[in-house]
Amino acid sequence: MGVRVKRFDLVRVKDSEAYKDSDFVAVEEPLNIRTCFEKCEDFAIIMRTPGDDKELSLGFLYSEGVINSIHDVEDIKQVENNVIEVKLNKPIGIRIRELIVNSSCGVCGRAFLYTLNILKSDLKVKREVIFSFPEKLREKQSVFNISGGLHATALFNPQGELLFIYEDVGRHNAVDKVVGRLLLEDKIPASNYIMQVSGRLGYEIVSKGIKAGIPIICGISAPTSLAIEIAEEAGLTLIGFLRGKSLNIYTHSERIY
């Protein structure tokens, strides 16, 4: 696992007084994802927080449509600190990327929209269970609690148990790590789980969840208009402004009682 935080010297100003200090900062480094079928080729370079690179790579390739399940992958190995190779059992059939994916937007610069899955899930969750998610998320954000600089995504079951959590400088990377974990456990479509994110609910976050078959996505901030529109179309329950004992249900409220 790579280093996730580094300490840097700084000048801190408080109450108009300046003094020398130091602080921990979240690490951001490139990850070169190479896909291998007959020969290995560079597929994408992702700016990310080191660690959980296997989950990130698998989730990213799934979101890109390169793989449909873990059964499309013969092997995955970290050949260097910032290079990972994914051996496939079929050619990828799509053009190799020609851009660096930055940590704030995975689809910036591309005219790319997912073909939406229509979610089929009878999952219903109590409001009181949903209300517990943000605090449970914060308690488990180990790197954020040190540096204050990472996004987090967690997966919960209907009883409110936090199953796993991933952090990254990129909010969509954290989602890809969750999806990658689901792939590794062969749990896609994830029709009996709820995903909680630490930030806003944009199109990309929501579409990745839909593709993984997750029927309920919650965030502590606002959704975008496109996120609401695709959630409605796909049958996703989208919850925003989840804070304390309040929340907004934007689509398919029938799953929350």
Curated annotation (Swiss-Prot):
Give the UniProt record's GO annotations in the biological process aspect.
Answer: Mo-molybdopterin cofactor biosynthetic process
Listed GO CC annotations: cytoplasm
Keyword annotations for this protein, in alphabetical order, are: Cytoplasm, Molybdenum cofactor biosynthesis
Q: Where is the active site?
A: 105 (cysteine persulfide intermediate)
Q: Name one Pfam family in it.
A: FdhD-NarQ
- Asked if Cytoplasm is a keyword of the record, the answer is yes
Q: Which GO terms describe its molecular function?
A: sulfur carrier activity; sulfurtransferase activity
Q: Where in the cell is it found?
A: Cytoplasm
| Role noted for this protein | Required for formate dehydrogenase (FDH) activity. Acts as a sulfur carrier protein that transfers sulfur from IscS to the molybdenum cofactor prior to its insertion into FDH.
Which NCBIfam families does the UniProt entry name for this protein?
Answer: fdhD_narQ (TIGR00129)
The record's comment on protein family reads: Belongs to the FdhD family.
Know the name of this protein? Answer: Sulfur carrier protein FdhD
What is the native source organism of this protein?
Answer: Saccharolobus solfataricus (strain ATCC 35092 / DSM 1617 / JCM 11322 / P2)
